[in-house]
């Protein structure tokens, strides 16, 4: 099963990053920094498992992949209108648009327009944003290992 890099050349903070503004807490995912309102492509195929709002992460979508992972897409500009729980998505299918910037604030943890992605094995549970840090999978490494393509 192939995974894609959603925004090649725009990678930012990785899983575990200890930037000073995180107050000693490790980053719980990986960030990409495309232009605000860029269309976010599904990183791989699967089904939508959850769509929700978080005060910290803003508009979020969780995808259950066909190979047993959950992918959290966070800081979306708005709740996706064309997706609902159970929607089937293929790699490259639109998940939403990048938010978190001046035009589309999305969650208190947003440091400007970007896509935050967190991943875990489905056995850890659908609430990817709440599981223990030790159960998270590094999105950059996973995508690179799984043959990232544009």
Regions found by a protein language model. Give the residues of each.
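Acidic, glycine-rich catalytic/binding loops that coordinate metals and/or anionic ligands
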Residues: 1-6, 84-90, 110-150
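Conserved metal-binding segment of the jelly-roll/cupin
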Residues: 91-101
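Zn2+-dependent peptidoglycan hydrolase active-site motif and core
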Residues: 42-85, 99-115
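A generic structural motif
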Residues: 33, 64-66, 120-122
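Surface-exposed, glycine-biased beta-strand/turn segments
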Residues: 1-60, 91, 104, 141, ...
